[in-house]
Amino acid sequence: MTPELAHDLKASVRTIPDYPKPGIMFRDITTLMGDPRSFRRAVDELVQPWAGSKIDKVAGIEARGFIIGGAIAHQVSSGFVPIRKKGKLPHTCVSMEYTLEYGTDHIEIHVDAITPGERVILVDDLIATGGTAEGAIKLLRQIGAEVVAACFIIDLPDLGGAAKVRSMGVPVRTLVEFGGH
């Protein structure tokens, strides 16, 4: 990725101070997604390392991972699989508890969403501490997926999430970094 593209993508992300609580700088990608050129460039850049590779499914983490993941699935001609909060999927699910900054939560996937051995890219808008991504990778592996990569538009490297995912043996692709929380 060129420095100019990285600059343009970073500039297209809106920062909202003190949301959802004081001291947090919320990185809002809806402005990036609302700009057709920025959105296309971000999706193209995220999938570039896997262009021409066999990718069976793209798994997106609720909610912004659905938007980005759907676009990536279209780009690589694969299926899309939603990973949702507990109780939001209508069919038989497999659930995984994961760690948040303050406590735990659960995510789910349909038990038949992945055929064992399928190659899957995990997608979300942002990686911070990596707790949700770690839970999603464990969940995908539990139902037989080979997680070939995890892609995020934004990395908050001070929080260590990308390093956590890499320590699980999953390559990480991010486009822009922001310091702090």
UniProtKB/Swiss-Prot annotation:
First and last residue of the signal peptide: none
UniProt superkingdom: Bacteria
UniProt-listed Enzyme Commission number(s): 2.4.2.7
CDD domains in the cross-refs: PRTases_typeI
Catalytic activity, as annotated: AMP + diphosphate = 5-phospho-alpha-D-ribose 1-diphosphate + adenine
GO molecular function: adenine phosphoribosyltransferase activity
BP term (GO), one: AMP salvage
Keyword Cytoplasm: yes
Record's keyword annotation contains Transferase: yes
GO cellular component annotations of the record: cytoplasm
Pathway(s) it belongs to: Purine metabolism; AMP biosynthesis via salvage pathway; AMP from adenine: step 1/1
Keyword field: Cytoplasm, Glycosyltransferase, Purine salvage, Transferase
Sections of the chain in a coiled coil: none
Subcellular compartments: Cytoplasm
Protein's job: Catalyzes a salvage reaction resulting in the formation of AMP, that is energically less costly than de novo synthesis.
Alphabetized NCBIfam families for the sequence: apt, PRK02304.1-3, PRK02304.1-5
Quaternary assembly: Homodimer.
Family (UniProt): Belongs to the purine/pyrimidine phosphoribosyltransferase family.
Name of the protein in question: Adenine phosphoribosyltransferase
Protein source organism: Rhodopseudomonas palustris (strain HaA2)
